[in-house]
Amino acid sequence: LNVNTYLIKNINVIPMHKDTVLANKTIFVHNGIIKNIESKIIVDDIEIIDGKNQFISPGLIDMHTHLWDKQELGLYLANGVTTIRNLWGYSMHLRLKDKLQKNKIIGPMLFTSSPKLTSKDDFGDDKVQIETKEEAKKLVIDYKQRGFDFIKIYAGINEDIYKTIINQSKKSGISIIAHPSREIPYLDQFNSQVASLEHTEEIVQQALNYEIDSLKLPPIIQKFVDSKKSFCPTITGFYKIYEMLDKGEEVINNGAINYMNPLIKTVDSKVQYNRWANEKTNNSSITETIYKQHLFHLYILKKMNEKGVNIISGTDSGIGITVPGASIHQELSFYKEAGLSNYDALKTATINPTKTHKEFEQMGSIQKGKFANFIVTKKNPLVNLNELKKPEWIMVNGRKVDKTTLNKYSQNAKNRNNLVVTALRYLEYLLVER
């Protein structure tokens, strides 16, 4: 029997390319691809999965992650995430991608950006500082040749380097993901080579110059509409600042933090917590200020959705206290809170990413010719998105993973002790990329 070939019978299909439920269908999966969806399909000598009249929807896509180890791949699967876009890439991610593609390990489909590119005055070892246009060109060519899927540009990139990267990316045929730059007017960052702009807080902090002013929003939202740019809100990543301020040290000592990579937990989580704890000491109103900005982020999202902007769900997971996997459910709940319907919220993590990159076209919906990336739940997630938190089983690239195995992946990630290995990989990044 082919492990990636099945008939899934007696299942209710949530296709996601339209707002409907196809009751009591059979799905024929062959070599990891959906071949047919009908009321009745007969295929000889094939493994049959009884869908038990449950609900099958496309696997979730997290469009803004920071991946540190194999255990996080398991955490994503355990939460129904079958595709991730890693946005701080280096050699390790290319190796993981290769292993996933050769089925040596199981995990979500992995797409990774290059290292984060910025200009020479934007300090920090997490970024590659570019001094000359020649250097910028060479890096884009090199990243494409090495197998990175996208170029990631960062907040300190100046206009000259930005234009050089844009031009070389066009020539090299590689799209760009933009953390908007502080050095360039926000509305000038919608180049056709840019596939998506990240982070709602950058609209407030850059485009609006920290003013929570709804009257200044329309031209910004219209720019997204006119340019057909995808927008990745990362509401959860910003909200974690409020959680740190509101809940105190508890958030870096107990609970969800135990699923973070130990190097991040030891260094980044503490650094971020201390930064905001110090801010609170000096500014008693900071908690309220951050919460007000969070609510404004939800308002921005509501207005974007009303205008038909292509919103793609991304969490900023893997840094600070934003946990890989589980954060997608918090992100979707924020979209719901912002006023999106369950269907519109779920679109952001399924069908909408397919409009962002050509590499994603075979995902995001349950249709003929698409990858067999599924979540199966007892009840209908279009009635309650929380159903997605508890998959009965999932399928990734046609490989079925049952509930027991998913639970094991979560347990394997909890309080893991790979700090030294992660530190060595980070050292490799510093030596190779910088």
Give, region by region, the residue ranges found by the protein language model.
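Mature N-terminal segment immediately following signal peptide/propeptide cleavage
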Residues: V3-H30, K35-N36, G51-P58
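Divalent metal-coordination and catalytic microenvironments
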Residues: I11, I27, G32, N53, ...
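Acidic, glycine-enriched loop/beta-strand segments at the rims
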Residues: V13-T26, S39, V323, S341-L346, ...
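Divalent-metal coordination cores built from histidine and acidic residues
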Residues: G51, F55-I56, L73-R182, V194-T200, ...
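Acidic/histidine-rich helix-loop elements
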Residues: L117-K133, I203-I212, T281-T289
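Active-site neighborhoods of metal-dependent hydrolases
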Residues: Q145-F150, I157, N209-F334, L430-R434
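Structural recognition of alpha->loop->beta junctions
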Residues: G147, D188-Y210, E331-D344
